Amino acid sequence: GEYDILFKELEVLEAKHPELITPDSPTRRVGSEPQTGFGTIQHRLPMLSLSNAMNNDELIAFDERMKKGLGTNIDIVYISEPKIDGLGVELVYEHGTYISGSTRGDGFIGEDITQNLRTIRSLPIKLRGEVIPTLLEVRGEVFIKKDDFATLNKTQEREEKPIFANARNAAAGSLRQLDSRITASRPLSI
């Protein structure tokens, strides 16, 4: 899509002008040496599974629970989108710079997958904008698009490796690799 076109343009630009390459460029995310195991990260606020809201009353009840949990009465702005079946993650930015990422885990403590998340090209390492918060915690899903999943399984089959049962398991397994170079080779989106 559009991202892929822009990524190619960036690769061409960096090839012509290496002086423009920055350490946080998406073209530089290739993974690092294997880890010996994952550490843990405690979530500042519990990372709970979201329930479906089927009507306005359920949305209002959700808003009331969020305000109570945050200890505030101010209006909260929500962004909603269709459900994506992937692995729930939390990203932490300090002064606009990505510093850590973790799985949901048990909702209170997750696995530290900072390095593996860093390999996802669409994940911004440095936030841009005029107003950057001191601390920003972002929660979302890492997933593999349907077409990318089909291509991944064809590659697995061609290389005589086991194919993945479904895209969610492929995404989760990719993020939990001790060798982030494997993660970097997978078509993950966030």
Model-derived features: positions:
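RNA/tRNA-interacting regions in translation and RNA-turnover enzymes
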Residues: G1-I190
